[in-house]
Amino acid sequence: MDEMHQVQLAIELIELGARLQVLETETELSRTRLIRLYKEVRGMSPPKGMLPFSADWFITWLPNIHSSLFYNIYLNIVNRTGCERIKAFVKAYRLYDEQVSLDDAEPVLGLTRAWTLIRFFESDILQLSMCARCGGRFVSHAHAPTQGYICGICQPPSRAGKTRKACGTKYVATCDR
């Protein structure tokens, strides 16, 4: 990929919310150049700190639903179009974001977590398991038994959706009424 395409990719990733570590891994641009680009696009310095590193986050109820949606979109793009990994990733993330925004919801899966998810699949840390009830394919730990797997949509946890934010109130207990 030539330098112009590298810069365009970096700008696109920054606009979508990529962290500096993602940019460094996916482009060949120098760290200094990426920081300058980030400041130009976002108007501030890139955030510091470690990237998410736990695969367990992707297994919890709501993140699992969103991660599964995103990863299935990504796989579909890769398998049907044959476009390169990073382009498929950007297209899949845009489609995921578009799909979630149809319900006026905030995306649970940020771009950096989506990128980490793909890396976990590539490293054989995560896999897709088919739900025995609905037939959907959901993110699960690699090498976990898949026979009789039931997804979080078919069998949500008892407190699913009963958060302060979902209730629109300060007290969670009022959701139970």
Question: Which ranges hold each PLM region?
Answer:
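Long, charge-rich, low-complexity intrinsically disordered regions
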Residues: M1-E12, L16, Q21-R177
